[in-house]
Amino acid sequence: MKGLKIAAIASVSLLLVMLVLVGYLFLTAEVQVMDVSSQGISAASNFERFEQLKASVIDGTFQGTLYQKPRDWKEASEYVYLTYTIRLRNNCLVPIDMVEAQVVPLSGDILQIGSFDVRSLDLKSEGDLTVQILAPKDTHPVRELIVTYYLWGVSGSVKTLYGN
C-alpha cells in the first residue's frame, strides 16, 4: 500500500510539473513585429494584373478583402500597389502554426490582395510576411497592420503602425 501511495504522489507531482511547463509554453507564446517596410508601385507598371483585379471585382470573383467597390474605375495610373513587408519573430519554444496580416484601410483604399500561402514560424525564428493593398495614387503609406497568429489552434494578435 505504501508503494502505491508513493507512486500516486509521484504521478500527481509529475502531472503538475507537466501542466506548469505546458502552461508556461502557452502563456509565453509571443510573436513580435521587429520591422515594417513599405513600397509603393504604380498599378500602371503591371497593367495586366490591374485589369485582372478590376475584372474580378466587377464580376464578384475577387479573392481577398474588398474594402470598397469603386463605382467608376479610373485609369491604372491613378492607383498604387502598397506592399508592406513585416519582419516577425517567434519568441516561443513552440512553432507558430499560421500567421496572417490585415491592413486596416483608410477611406479610399480599394482592396487587399488575398494570399493563399500558409505561413508559419518555427520555434525561436524570424520570418517575413508580405501584404499588398490597392489604393489611390495620392495616398500616404501610414497604415495600422494587424498580425494574427495561431498556436495550438488558439489565436493571438499584434497591432503595429507603419509610418507616422
Predicted feature residues:
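Structural beta-strand segments of beta-rich domains
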Residues: 80-86, 127
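Hydrophobic beta-strand segments
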Residues: 99-103
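N-terminal Sec-pathway targeting helices
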Residues: 1-18
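Short, solvent-exposed, Trp/other aromatic-anchored flexible loops in extracytoplasmic proteins
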Residues: 110-146, 150-154
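Short acidic/proline- and small/hydrophobic-mixed sequence motifs that coincide with surface turns
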Residues: 93-98, 142
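Low-complexity, acidic Ser/Thr/Pro/Gly-rich terminal tails and inter-domain linkers that flank the onset
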Residues: 26-80, 106-108
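Asparagine-centered strand-capping/turn motif at beta-strand->loop junctions
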Residues: 86-92
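Short beta-strand elements
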Residues: 156-164
